[in-house]
Amino acid sequence: FVMKNMLNFKNFTADELMDILNLALDMKKNPEKYAHALDGKKLYTLFEKTSTRTFLSFTTGITELGGTYYNQLWKDSNFTLGEPVSEIKYVCRNVDIIMARLVKNETVELFGDNVTVPFINGCDSSYHPCQILADALTIIEKFGSLDVKLMYIGAKNNVFNSLVEFFAKMKRGTIYGLTPLVNNTVCGDDFFEAAKATGHYVELDPTMSMEEAKKYAKDMDILYTDTWVDMEFFNNPAYKQQKEETLAKMMPYQLNEEFTEGSKAIVFHDMPMHQGFEISQGVIDKNLNHILDEAENRRHAEKAVMYTLLNS
C-alpha cells in the first residue's frame, strides 16, 4: 500500500490521470451510484488564500459522496504560531484526507512530506492541479478527447505550469504558451524544456505582438487566460504600483473581441475574472457557459481525486 498525495502531477502516470477523469465523468453522469462512496470519511480543508470555487467544490463534493468536511482558515489556526510539522501530524489523527489552499509551494511540500493521510494541493504559488483536471474534464466533454490545440495567453503562473505539466504528461493535444509575464514559481527552465521535448508544449516568443498571436489563435480549439495579478494582491494597497506596472505591460495581451475575431476557439478562464483587464466583457458574455462548465467541473474532478486517493 502506497499512500498517494496530489501536490502536482509528478506522482501520477498518464493512465492514472485518465482513470481519474473517466471516474469524474461517471460520477457526474451517475451521482446516485456514488452517493455513499465515501460514507463516514472526514475531509479537512485549510485556506490561507481566499476562495470561492475551491471551497465550494471540495465541500459539496465530499458531501455528495457521503462524507463530511471541517473547514479552517489559516489565520484562525495555530499553523501561524508554532512548529508546523507537529500541527500537520495532529490534524492527520482526526481526519481521513486533507485539502489545503496555501500561498507558498514550500508549505505544500511540507504537508506532502509529513502527512499520514492523503493530501491534495488546492492551489499554491507554483501548481493548481485540480483546476487543470477540471479543464481536462471540460475538454473531453466538449471535444470528445484531449487531442486539442490550446493557446494560453497571460502570466507564467501556477495554472500555466499545471497546464504544461498535464499536456506533457498525457502526451495528448498541444498547449501553446504566450507568457510575457513571469510570476514567481518553482518551475524553472528544466521543467519547461522537458515539456517542450515531448512535443506537446510550444513556447511562443513572449515579445510576439497580438497581431502575430492572432494568426495562431485562428487554428486553436481553446483560448485560455488567467488573472495577471495574484488574487491576494489585487486589492492590496501595498502592491498598487507593481499592479499598475503589470497591468500596463499586459493590457496589449487582453483576450478581447478583436483578438478572438475569426477564431473558432472557445474561451477558458479559471476564475475569478477581471473584466476589462485580461478578458473583455464581450468575450466573457459569449463564453460564460463554457467558463461556468469549467468551474462546475472542479467539483466532479475533485470528487474523483478524493475517491482515488482514499482508495489507492
Description of each model-found segment:
Residues 2-56:
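Positively charged, low-complexity intrinsically disordered leader regions
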Residues 36-140, 275:
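Phosphate/diphosphate ligand-binding glycine-rich loop within oxidoreductases
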Residues 37-43, 146-148, 172, 264:
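Phosphate-coordination loops involved in phosphoryl transfer and adenosine-cofactor binding
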Residues 48-60, 141-225, 231-233:
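Glycine-rich phosphate/diphosphate-binding loop of Rossmann-like nucleotide-binding domains
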Residues 65, 94, 114-116, 171, ...:
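Short, structured coil segments at secondary-structure junctions
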Residues 196-282:
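Rossmann-like adenosine-cofactor binding region
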Residues 264-312:
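Adenosine-phosphate binding glycine-rich loop
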